[in-house]
Amino acid sequence: PTYHDGQLSPVVGVHNIQLVRANREHPDPSNGNGWTYNHQPMLAYWSGQFYYQYLADPSDEHVPPSQTFLMTSKDGYQWTNPEIVFPPYKVPDGYTKESRPGMQAKDLIAIMHQRVGFYVSKSGRLITMGNYGVALDKKDDPNDGNGIGRVVREIKKDGSFGPIYFIYYNHRFNEKNTDYPYFKKSKDREFVKACQEILDNPLYMMQWVEEADREDPIIPLKKGYKAFNCYTLPDGRIASLWKHALTSISEDGGYTWEQPVLRAKGFVNSNAKIWGQRLSDGTYATVYNPSEFRWPLAISLSKDGLEYTTLNLVHGEITPMRYGGNYKSYGPQYPRGIQEGNGIPADGDLWVSYSVNKEDMWISRIPVPVELNASAHANDDFSKSKAISELTDWNIYSPVWAPVSLDGQWLKLQDKDPFDYAKVERKIPASKELNVSFDLQAGQNDKGTLQIEFLDENGIACSRLELTQDGVFRAKGGSRFANMMKYEAGKTYHVEAVLSTADRNIQVYVDGKRVGLRMFYAPVASIERIAFRTGIPRTFPTVDTPADQTYDLPGAGEQEPMAEYRIANVKTSSADKDASSAFLKYKDFSHYADYFNGMEDENIVQAIPNAKASEWMEDNIPLFECPQRNFEEMYYYRWWSLRKHIKETPVGYGMTEFLVQRSYSDKYNLIACAIGHHIYESRWLRDPKYLDQIIHTWYRGNDGGPMK
C-alpha cells in the first residue's frame, strides 16, 4: 500500500471507466444533482444492457437523507444519467433504538444500506431492491437489524419502473405503519412470484443478514459476517466470501455452511468487500483490496475456485478526495460484479463496479480469458478499430472529465480535470533492449501535460518523456530535465525511443533526428509497459494519511481549460535473446538453475561453470512448461547437467559421458558409444557451435584418425 498500485503488474486490457464524477458546486443530472457521498454499487446484465445501482447521501456516510440511483448502458462505456429508483424515506417521529438511549427520531430520513441490488426471476423479470435503515446520529449503524425494511420494484424493458413494495419488514414495522404496500398486494402475479423466489432463495437471504432482524429464522447463517457473496464450484457446491476474506462452503445450495468460518489462507483483506465470480471460461476470479487499506484494487485467479495463485492490478489510481465526509475512505473499493443468475454480458468479460473515495462511481471491464502477460509486441493501427472497447491490448483509465476515445487513426486523451488525468498503457513482453515508436500530436502547446513513461512489472518508471505546458518536449534524468525541442500545436511528430536496461539509457528521435540521450532515472531489469498520461504521478494518500478527511478541496467542482493529445501507430520491438518467443520466457524458469546450482558442491568444472549455467541455458535451450512440475524440473535438470559435460579441448568442444576420468575413455575423457546421444540432444541448442565442434572433435580431432 506504500504505492497506490501496490507495485502489481496489471492484467492485459483492463478498461477503467468513470460513470459519475461527484460535483457539489455544479449539481446536474449527470452527477446525481450534487450529492457527493456515492458508494456500494451493484451490477446486472439483462435484456441486452447493463444495470448499475448505487446509493447516495448528500455528503456523509450514514448522514441522511439517502437514496438509491440507477444507471443503464448498452455497451458499458456510455451510460444514462443516474435516476432515482428508491427515493428518500421518512422515519416515523418518535422512533428509538436501544443502542442510542435518550434519542428519538424527529423529521429524520432513513439511510439506505443494501448488499444486494438485483434479481432476475425464473420468468425473466428484473427486480431491483434496496433497504431502508436508520441512523440516529452519524456514528450509528443503519445495518444493525433495527431498520424499517427492504423494498423492491420491477425494472421494465422500456426503462420504466413498477411501484415500490416492501418485501421484508424489520421488527416494529408492517404494512400499517409504512409508506409502501407489501409485495403480495400487487395484482401482478409474476411479480409476486418473483418476490417469493427471492424469499425462498437462501443465497439472497445470506445477503440480507446485516439489515434483517437478528436471529430471524429466514437467515441461514446468523452470524455478523458482512458483505456476503458466492459462486458455484465445479462440483456444484457453493463457495462464499465475506469481508476480511472469511470463507465457507455449502453443500446444500446455501441452507447450511461449514463451520468454523475461516479466513482464506494467503488472502490479505481488511474491512472491505471482496468479490468472487466464476468466469465465462470456467475459471474463477476474486477482486478485492489486498491490503489493510482500500487500495489497490486487484484480481486473483483460480482454476478450481479454491486455490488462488495470482495477484495482478485492476485499478491502481487514487484521485484526491475532493469532498471530505463521515466514514469516507480513500481508494477504489467495494467491488461487485454480476451475481450468478443476473446475466452474462454479451462479450463474456468480467465487469466489476466499485466506488473511488466513496464519491465517484466506476466500472472496470476485464477481458476473459484473463491475460497476465502480453504475448506479442505492439503494432497498433487505431484506424482499424471502430470503438474503444476493441482495444483489448490497451489498459485504459478514462474519467468523465479526462476521457479516452478513438478519433479515426488517433487514440485521443482529453483532460479538463484539475484533480485527475486520462491514462493509457500498452503492456508488452518484458524487454531489456526495447525500441518504441509512435506518432504524437498535441492540440495545444500553452497548457496541459503529457507524460510518457516506460515501466517495469512493478510499475517503476525507468525513463519519462514529457510535453510541458510551455511547449517543450523534454526527458527526465534524475531530479533534472533535459529540454529536447520545442513542439507546435496541431503538428504530427514521429517519435522513436531506443531503451537499454544494460546501458541504462534512452535515445530519443523525432522525425528521424536524434534529439536526446539520457540515463535512466531508475534502474530496472526489464520494461513491460508504456504509459501515456495527461498529468503528474500521485503519491497522496500515503499509509500515514489520517483515515478521516473532514475538509473539502478548493475548486473541487471546477474545470481547467481542455487539453488534448493524440497518439497513433504505436509499435514496439525487442532485441532481447528471447524476443521472438511468443509465450514462454526464460525468467519464469530460471529458478531451476538456481536450485540445481545449490544442490551440491561443484568439484569438477569444465567449459561452462555453474555460475554461468543460467546464462547459458537462457541463450541456448528450448523452453518447456507443463502442469506436472516434477516433469518440468527433470527437463531443465537434463539441460543443466548436459551443460556440465561440455568440455574444451585443444581441437574444440567435446562432450563427456562421465565427469570423472574413465580408464576406457580417450585422452579427452570422451567415450565413443555416447556420440549419437550427444548429437541427438545437442542439435536443439540455439548456438550451433557446440554441435559443430563436438562432431568435428570426433571426426577430425586426431587428424581424421581414431581417437586415442
Features from the language model and the residues they span:
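Asp-box/BNR beta-propeller blade signature and adjacent active/binding-site loops
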Residues: 1-376
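Substrate-binding groove/exosite segments of carbohydrate-active enzymes
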Residues: 34-35, 39, 53, 222-226, ...
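Extracellular glycan-recognition surfaces and repeat-rich motifs
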Residues: 386-412
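Short tryptophan-centered beta-strand motifs in secreted/extracellular beta-sheet-rich domains
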Residues: 436-438, 490-500, 506-508
